[in-house]
Structure formats: structure tokens, C-alpha cells
């Protein structure tokens, strides 16, 4: 691990109260741990802007599995994808709805394009792309 450098941050008291509440609710050992996670998250999100290196994304979907031809359209998009599909996980939520996660690897723009194509299909009720990258720090 790198050397830890201490620095100070000035916050309005109300914001500090909210910070302390989040630290406690989420079980962080300290404000520093919480702050480090926030900084890492910001760096990862910013790394997606115009990134050309290989990144990771997880597309979470909820869809109606009885929707006409939805599964076939999803499969066509997956098979034609310009990204690597690392794995998929399928859960039957109830008789009508399925939850699926698709773990993707590739360039940011290509992952986002893939996700947008799937999310736009009729019968997809919810779609969220979680952006990830292996921090270089």
C-alpha cells in the first residue's frame, strides 16, 4: 500500500452531519475510508469519459419474459455485440418478470452502446449500467 497522506477538508456543519450519518449507516470504520471510496468512485466514473482502454460494466435488467420476441432480440444483440460478454445471470423474479445481469468487458462507448440497445427493447422495464474499472492506485 502507498504511504497515507493526511489532508484536511472544510465542510459546512450540516454536510459533515450527513457524512457522519452515512459513515455510520454504511458501517465504515472512519470518514477516511468513506472518503477514499467516494474518490475512487469518482475516478472510475470519470475514466469512462472517452476511455479507450478496456473497462468493465454490469448491465442489470428487469424484463417481461412473455414479451413477443424479446428474448430472441436480446440474443441477437448479445451475439452481435462488439464487447465481450463475460457472463450472464438469470433470475425468475415471478411468473412474468425476470432479472438478468450481463457482465461486459470492452471500450466504454461500446459497452454503453450495447446497454442502450438492450435497454431500448420493448418489454425491458428497468435497465441500469454499473460502470467499473480496476483502479490503478
Swiss-Prot record:
Its cofactor is Ni(2+). GO terms for biological process: response to nickel cation. The keyword Disulfide bond does not apply. Ni(2+) binds at residues 79, 90, 92, 98. Binds 1 nickel ion per subunit. Keywords: DNA-binding, Metal-binding, Nickel, Transcription, Transcription regulation. One of its GO terms (molecular function) is DNA-binding transcription factor activity. Pfam families: NikR_C (PF08753), RHH_1 (PF01402). InterPro entries: Acetolactate_synth/TF_NikR_C, ACT-like_dom_sf, Arc_rbn_hlx_hlx, CopG, CopG/NikR_regulator, Ni_resp_reg_NikR, Ribbon_hlx_hlx, TF_NikR_Ni-bd_C. HAMAP family: NikR. Belongs to the transcriptional regulatory CopG/NikR family. Transcriptional regulator. This is Putative nickel-responsive regulator. It comes from Campylobacter curvus (strain 525.92).
